[in-house]
A protein has these predicted regions:
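Core catalytic region of metal-dependent phosphoesterases/phosphodiesterases
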Residues: 6, 11, 15-118
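Conserved beta-sheet core of the metallophosphoesterase superfamily
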Residues: 102-197
């Protein structure tokens, strides 16, 4: 079993494609590319952690519940088991579409193909504790955090962890091996160089 990580997919409409200048004609092309890129590297034995913002639901875009559910069902087309860490877009959906009931949303999404939906999580990679979170301000101190939320704007490295947003890996998921490599590189270079712009 291998673990994979991504964040900030914003499936569902073209707003993020346009705002972030993602190199896709429309959200359908983007969704197909993401599903294809995931399925090229991950099997049904693997787990894909999506660290928030699977769907685009914000002050501009308010799809109805049926449209949200259809967007969540994209998970059924992916080979690996998909675990969604709640992002700020999903938090809005919990509030607006599930009467503020996280467990109600979680149950619905599991019935639509997700392995699980969690608020945050803790795993180990290569024996190292790793905290999974959407928004980096909610990070856990004293461990490496994998996060999203900031898209490509804050870069890959932070002193407290790594940004696994899809925009930072050519719209492919980061593998467990990628994370091990990036953490070694972070410690050997970024953490030692005050001028590397990761602080």
């Amino acid at each position: 079993m291998m673990l994979f990580f991504t964040a900030d997919l914003h499936f569902g409409d073209n707003e993020t494609i346009e705002r972030e200048s993602r190199p896709f004609t429309d959200v359908s092309e983007f969704e197909e590319t993401i599903v294809s890129n995931v399925n090229k590297v991950a099997s049904s034995e693997d787990i894909l952690y999506v660290l928030g913002d699977w769907i685009n639901y914000n002050c501009i875009n308010h799809p109805d519940l049926e449209a949200c559910q259809k967007t969540f069902e994209i998970s059924k087309r992916m080979n690996p088991k998909v675990v969604l860490v709640l992002g700020n877009n999903e938090e809005r959906i919990v509030r607006d579409k599930y009467d503020g009931d996280f467990q109600k949303m979680r149950s619905d999404l599991i019935s639509r193909g997700f392995e699980d939906v969690i608020k945050d999580g803790d795993i180990e990679i290569n024996g190292e504790p790793i905290h999974l979170i959407h928004c980096p301000v909610d990070r856990k101190e004293g461990v490496i955090n994998l996060f999203g939320h900031t898209h490509r704007w804050t870069g890959l490295w932070k002193p407290f962890g790594l940004n696994v947003g899809t925009d930072l890996n050519f719209f492919r998921p980061f593998s467990e091996k990628d994370i091990i490599y990036l953490l070694e590189h972070k410690r050997d270079w970024c953490d030692k160089d005050a001028n590397c712009h990761c602080m």
